[in-house]
Amino acid sequence: MPPEFSSESRRADFTNFCRNAAPLGDMRRVVVATEGASRHFEVDGVNAEELGWLFDLAGWRKPGNFTQTLRNAARSKFGWLERIPGRSGRYAATSLGISKTLPTG
């Protein structure tokens, strides 16, 4: 477990955030987990390895390949994630991704 994710109260908040969002599909779950990590663990994006831990915490089934799922969500067709410049393999949720995956209000 990455040290940023060690707080039990933050882990509980993250889990509630993910459950309340109730995303359907792997790409939406990746966006919700990425945004949840940003909000509740104050991290600057996530990588495929961290997503595995975050999916476990949220109680979600893992996709076959996190790296490919990240890339798909970041493709121009969707634009739900963006690569963080200078941070190899790290992605952050875009405002479009957040609007498409999180309930409003």
Give the location of each predicted region.
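Short, charged/polar micro-motifs that form catalytic or ligand-binding hotspots
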Residues: H40-F41, D56-W60, R87
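Short amphipathic alpha-helical interaction segments
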Residues: W60-S76
